[in-house]
Regions:
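Membrane-helix interface "capping/anchor" motifs
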Residues: 92-104
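Core mid-bundle transmembrane helix pairs that form the ion/substrate translocation pathway
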Residues: 131-132, 143-208
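Structural signature of hydrophobic alpha-helical transmembrane segments
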Residues: 8-16, 70-82, 127-133, 194-200
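Single conserved hydrophobic/aromatic residue that forms the stacking wall/gate
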Residues: 219-230
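Membrane-interface helix termini and inter-helical loops of multi-pass transporters
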Residues: 27, 64-74, 178-190
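Interfacial segments of multi-pass membrane proteins
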Residues: 30-37, 108-120
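N-terminal signal-anchor module of multipass membrane proteins
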Residues: 2-60
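Transmembrane alpha-helical segments of multi-pass membrane transport proteins and ion-pumping complexes
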Residues: 16-20, 24, 51-63, 87-95, ...
Length: 230
């Protein structure tokens, strides 16, 4: 086996664990916190894994084997070297320390040109700005309607279903975007064998994250908020 193939799979596995452990909790953290006392971890894992399978398989089918949804068209595949695999290794250390970081810049910077990184930076700043403004406006509206200091003993099935549906859609949208951070180590057109490897690996990693309760990243999410109201 060529050494570049070893670095390719090592980089993929490190990126898969780092990205899922870091970013997925930022996406599914409130979902996990709000439901962990009502459902066993494997039920939540099954729900998240089902959406993961749908998202990755759809991307693979619709984009001719490209699970990144063609988000890596500006970053052509190149032979993976040790320094490429170093980036997700550093991300893994930061994740284990409970430090939320930008996986996109840390992982893709090892592959992308300065021009591509500049465009990514502009899009990220604009995206974060719009998200922050919209979130703040929504919060202003909601906080005038719901009094979080008041007990709410009545649980309505509608809210539970709405939470699961919205969390599933958010998870699906996140996978469409951030799978590029994992798929950058792999050929742009995957065969069926590599697709199965990707699915099994990511499902097992996601299961470990759910089994451990989300790790340190979930603690940082839960501390300043009241996720049980979500």
């Amino acid at each position: 086996m060529e050494l570049s193939i070893v670095w390719m799979y090592l980089g993929f596995f490190l990126a898969a664990y780092s990205v899922i452990a870091n970013d997925s909790i930022q996406t599914l953290g409130t979902f996990l916190s709000a439901n962990k006392n009502d459902f066993p971890w494997y039920t939540l894992w099954f729900a998240a894994s089902l959406m993961l399978i749908i998202s990755i398989t759809y991307g693979w089918y619709a984009y001719d084997g490209d699970i990144s949804y063609e988000r890596l068209t500006r970053i052509p595949y190149q032979e993976v070297q040790w320094y490429h695999a170093l980036a997700p290794g550093i991300l893994l250390l930061l994740t284990r320390s409970g430090i939320p970081v930008s996986t996109t810049f840390l992982v893709l910077s090892a592959f992308a040109s300065v021009t591509v990184l500049e465009k990514m930076l502009v899009k990220s700043i604009v995206g974060y700005g719009i998200a922050a403004i919209v979130a703040y406006l929504v919060w202003i509206i909601i906080e005038r309607i719901i009094n979080e200091k008041q007990d709410h003993p009545t649980h309505r099935k509608f809210w539970r279903v709405s939470q699961w549906v919205s969390s599933g859609w958010l998870w699906f949208a996140w996978l469409q975007h951030d799978m590029a951070n994992i798929a950058v180590f792999l050929p742009r057109q995957l065969d069926l064998t590599n697709l199965i490897i990707v699915l099994i690996s990511t499902i097992l990693i996601l299961g470990y994250v759910f089994y451990t309760g989300g790790g340190l990243s979930l603690i940082h999410i839960s501390e300043p908020t009241r996720p049980y109201w979500i």
